[in-house]
Curated annotation (Swiss-Prot):
It catalyses: GTP + H2O = GDP + phosphate + H(+). Residues 81-84 are annotated as: G3. GO terms for molecular function: GTP binding; GTPase activity; translation elongation factor activity. The keyword Metal-binding applies. Mg(2+) binds at T26. This is Elongation factor Tu. GO terms for cellular component: cytosol. Residues 60-64 are annotated as: G2.
Amino acid sequence: MAKAKFERTKPHVNIGTIGHVDHGKTTLTAAITTVLAKQGKAEAKAYDQIDAAPEERERGITISTAHVEYETDARHYAHVDCPGHADYVKNMITGAAQMDGAILVVSAADGPMPQTREHILLSRQVGVPYIVVFLNKCDMVDDEELLELVEMEVRDLLSEYDFPGDEVPVIKGSALKALEGDPQWEEKIIELMNAVDEYIPTPQREVDKPFMMPIEDVFSITGRGTVATGRVERGTLKVGDPVEIIGLSDEPKTTTVTGVEMFRKLLDQAEAGDNIGALLRGVSRDEVERGQVLAKPGSITPHTKFKAQVYVLTKEEGGRHTPFFSNYRPQFYFRTTDVTGIITLPEGVEMVMPGDNVEMTVELIAPIAIEEGTKFSIREGGRTVGAGSVSEIIE
């Protein structure tokens, strides 16, 4: 039988399974594909196929991630599942797998555990906007009251991290029983996917967001002016649009785009994903540099001080061999450039060991265009020693 081709006509959403080790994330992922495969909407994947996730490198960090895809009547999904806890932490902080929503798997037999809390906290800090709960292993719990107790605990935990605990859909099921083909539990997988369809909104597409392009290179064309090149990160740009040049200087500079080129051809409009050159009116060669961004005026602002959630590479990953302390001054690599910054660790945290993840405050020596969710690397002498995600802007 020929492989079915996924139709790209449906809206696309990125999701993933999160939760404590052994609560059934991978079994649930397998169950979703298996149940949907019976309706011809997925290719069934066995537990072992998902569990043997290939290693990928993102910002110099090795992460094991399994990717599966499937669809419902409403949407097309790309779903990530990580075998190990450390893989989740790295994945979420580097943004290697950007999630529009997550399915939090909690074993009804055990209730919320430390990594349940940690994954909810990470979701909050790296900007996973919506969570749907799957209470797993319900076939092992005879006591209805116990199920309700676990559900309440999970809802309280979500509320603690500013998710709407009262509104979050909670589906009670058994991934293993569904995987084994028990119709009563297969129905719960359908129920879960309906909740995901309805509760997790279709994300705004990158092209619909305000324009932004990190500047990679700058050159001047005699008689025409200054050109900034880079890959459009989001939004669209056309000739005549006003843009701001933001970062590395105290005040953003506003200018107008007088030409947009791609592969040396003139373009009416550039959009997210395009590599372009933008001709800037009245801007001299020394007023623009790599590391700045071009953006729709007022859409993003330069900052020097922020809080961030950071994963520190282990020695084996090529990171530091020794811990670091407050006042550590590495380079912070944002998009296209390094800026020195000073780290302040939270109260009660003396030092950070390779392999840890920690929230820290960073003060940069020059302003950079950042917002909540902006990703960065921490570098020392050109090698990556950490990866982070901005969780809060201070100034």
